[in-house]
Amino acid sequence: MEYIKKIALYMSVLLLIIFIGGCGNMKDEQKKEEQTNKTDSKEEQIKKSFAKTLDMYPIKNLEDLYDKEGYRDGEFEKGDKGMWVLYSSIVSEFKGESLKSRGMILKLDRNKRTAKGSYIIRELKEDKNHDVQKNEKKYPVKLVNNKIIPTEDVKNEDLKREIENFKLFSQYGEFKSLNTDRITNISYNPNAPNYSAEYKINDDDNNIKQLKNRFNIKSNKNPKLLFKGAGNIKGSSVGYKEIQIIFNRNKEESVSCIDSIEFKPSEGDYNE
């Protein structure tokens, strides 16, 4: 009997040693991972954030986002599944003319599995006193069976077709062949905090071809992809991340595409 007790005690001690050792190894691995994140320079963190954002593209079926989780922080209430906010627009300004933009914002509520937004036409112009005059029109839209449709009557048939045929850049943009070595001009301001980076694109890139074709953009220069963000580099529901594809930006003309995919806390009562 004493012999059996000694064996049982020995086995208990052995298992305890193995368990403690295993926990120690897990902690060591966690420490190594944390240390890696800490030792990453801000430049590397911004590059990774850039690549992670572009990895979301394309979202061919927007309704897939109802089942996709995003980065959550302390701003989310318990039980809130959050919402995806998509924005895409083309902004242009030519010498002697006003700044114009046409685009869309779409909010996909993961709690209610509904998506609503607006097609927005904006025009900004300076008057003789150099005050900026803003003219904005919004046309409410919703997403049904992965199709965007106006929720109110649009009397202008051309505008109605324009809204119905509009595609967010996130629906067709594709960056699977992204080479992080080509990310340049990285900057970080810890006081704001905000950050930015650039990526060189060739004029024959498929994204560029699609944008030119969809919006009748005439430019033979190699565009650049600008990545901008504010808040925590890892993610922040109170900050933002957006991409800009800049075709031209000079005294004569400025043409660019702005696009963003953000995950935010839901608006209103998400338990309805």
From Swiss-Prot:
Disulphide linkage map: none
Keyword Protease: no
Membrane topology: Lipid-anchor
Residues with a covalently attached lipid (N-palmitoyl cysteine): 23
Cellular component GO terms, alphabetical: plasma membrane
Record carries keyword Lipoprotein: yes
Database matches in Pfam families: DUF576
Keywords: Cell membrane, Lipoprotein, Membrane, Palmitate, Signal
Main location group: membrane
Gene3D superfamilies recorded: 2.50.20.40
Database matches in NCBIfam families: SA_tandem_lipo
Family: Belongs to the staphylococcal tandem lipoprotein family.
Protein known as: Uncharacterized lipoprotein SAR0445
Protein species of origin: Staphylococcus aureus (strain MRSA252)
